[in-house]
Amino acid sequence: AMISDTQRWYNSTEDVVKALNARGDIDFVIHGGDQSDFGVTKEFIWMRDIFNKFQMPYVCLLGNHDCLGTGEDAYRAIYGDPNFAFTAGNVRFICLNTNAMEYDYSEPVPDFNFIENELNNLSPEIEKTVFAMHVKPFEFVFNNNVAKIFQLYVNQFPKVQFCLYGHEHKFAVDDLFNDGVLYFQCPCIDKRIYLLFTIKEDGTYD
C-alpha cells in the first residue's frame, strides 16, 4: 500500500492506519514523503508514533517539506538515509530523494551513484523493480536537467513495474516518457485515499 503527504492531517493519518490494519492483506506500506509541513522535529515524532501503530512494516520517503529547517536531520535520525532500497519477494523497491530544489548542489539529487550501485549489485533473484520518490520528473522541484538521464537509469533495471510518487496532493497516472513505464501519484491523506498494488508472478499487477 502507499500513502503520502500526511503533513498536519493527524486524524486522517490515524484513520488510514486503522483502515490498512483492518484489511489483513497488506504486506507493507510506503509513505511517499511530506510527513511534516515545516520540518519541525515534533512533526516527525508525532507522525512516527502514529505510523508505529501499523501492524505491518512501513518505510518513509523524504519529501520537500521534510527538508525545511532541520527537518532532514530529524528524518535521518528516525529513518536513516533518504536513498534506500529493499526487497519483497523477487521485487526490488528503490526509494529515492528527488527534492533537488531543496539543495544547493552540495548533494547529488537524484543520487546516480546510489542508483548505479543498486544496478550493479542486484541479486540474481530480483526479477522486477519498483521506483518510489516524492517528486516526479518534470515537476519543478526535480532536477530536470537530468530527467531523461534518470529515466535511462530506471529502464536499465529488470522489468520495471511502475514508479510511485506523491507531492502534488492528487491522483494521477502518466506515462511521462512515453516508454510504457507508468508513474502513479498518491494523493495527500486529506483526500482519504491510499493506493494498493498487487504485483503478480507473471509480471503484471493490479
Language model features by range: what are they?
Residues 131-137, 161-171:
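Histidine-centered catalytic micro-motifs
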Residues 5, 33-34, 63-64, 134, ...:
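Active-site glycine-centered loops adjacent to acidic/histidine catalytic or metal-binding residues
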Residues 139-151:
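Hydrophobic alpha-helical
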Residues 1-46, 126:
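N-terminal active-site segment of His-dependent metallophosphoesterases
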Residues 6-11, 35-42, 67-72, 104-106, ...:
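Acidic-and-aromatic substrate-binding clefts and catalytic sites of carbohydrate-active enzymes
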Residues 32-33, 97-100, 135:
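Short, histidine-centered active-site or binding-site loop motifs used for metal coordination
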Residues 41-128, 148-159, 170-201, 205:
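Extended active-site neighborhood of metal-dependent phosphoesterases/phosphodiesterases
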